[in-house]
Design a protein with these regions (language model features):
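Active-site HxH/HxHxD metal-binding segment of metal-dependent hydrolases
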Residues: 1-29
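A short helix-to-beta-strand connector/capping loop
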Residues: 28-36, 49, 136, 162-165
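Structural beta-sheet core signal
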Residues: 1, 77-78, 140-142
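Hydrophobic pocket-lining residues within nucleotide cofactor-binding pockets
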Residues: 6, 58, 145
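Divalent metal-coordination and catalytic microenvironments
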Residues: 11, 53, 67, 81, ...
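Fold-independent oxyanion-binding glycine-rich loops
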Residues: 4-5, 80-82, 104
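Cap/insert and terminal regions of metallo-dependent hydrolase folds
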Residues: 84-173
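Core dinuclear metal-dependent hydrolase active-site scaffold
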Residues: 32, 36-89, 173-177
Length: 177
């Protein structure tokens, strides 16, 4: 399992602690565990399973990150939980983005909550997308919409008349790019 050091520490303390679950980082033997926790930092570039990825900055209330994976058609980007994020925009500037998966947790009536919790609402999403200067043909998928918010969030995004196609990810659906 690869993750930020803070996330891996939380897994050690709260999950793999022999209270909730056994410590699989030491089982069946300390020298041959089932599970290895491997830290990474924002900005790290890794090759995992033949796929080149980069760990991206996120702006959230707890340690978080995004991921970009290089593909033959460009970069597939997942923002993770994030609010407005100048560091992410700078990191992505000039890259050919094949697809962007970006969180949009709350509707615009709950924008204040989105700001406090460092998430996005539709109008905040629009600001981020326009500042990214993406090719209008880049597919934009929203994710992390809070329960009961999907109709309001997608309706508000549609009303923004953005120059790119924005759609909500659907559970169980497979996407190719």
């Amino acid at each position: 399992v690869h993750g930020l050091p803070e996330t891996l520490d939380a897994l050690r303390r709260h999950i793999f602690n022999n209270v909730i679950w056994p410590d699989f980082t030491r089982l069946p033997h300390a020298d041959r565990p089932i599970l290895e926790l491997v830290p990474f930092q924002v900005g790290d570039r890794l090759t995992l399973g033949g796929l080149r990825i980069e760990i991206l900055p996120a702006w959230h209330t707890v340690p978080a990150c995004g991921v970009a994976a290089e593909t033959p058609s460009g970069w597939w980007v997942f923002t993770g939980d994030t609010g407005p994020n100048p560091a992410l925009r700078e990191c992505l500037r000039g890259r050919p983005i094949a697809q962007l998966v970006i969180e949009t947790a709350f509707n615009d009536e709950e924008r204040a909550l989105a700001e406090i919790s460092r998430h996005l609402s539709p109008s905040m999403l629009a600001q981020e997308l326009l500042q990214l200067d993406l090719d209008p043909n880049t597919p934009i998928a929203i994710t992390h919409v809070k329960p009961g918010e999907m109709a309001a969030v997608t309706g508000q995004i549609a009303a923004l008349d953005l120059p790119m196609t924005v759609f909500a990810l659907t559970r169980g659906e497979r996407y190719r790019f």
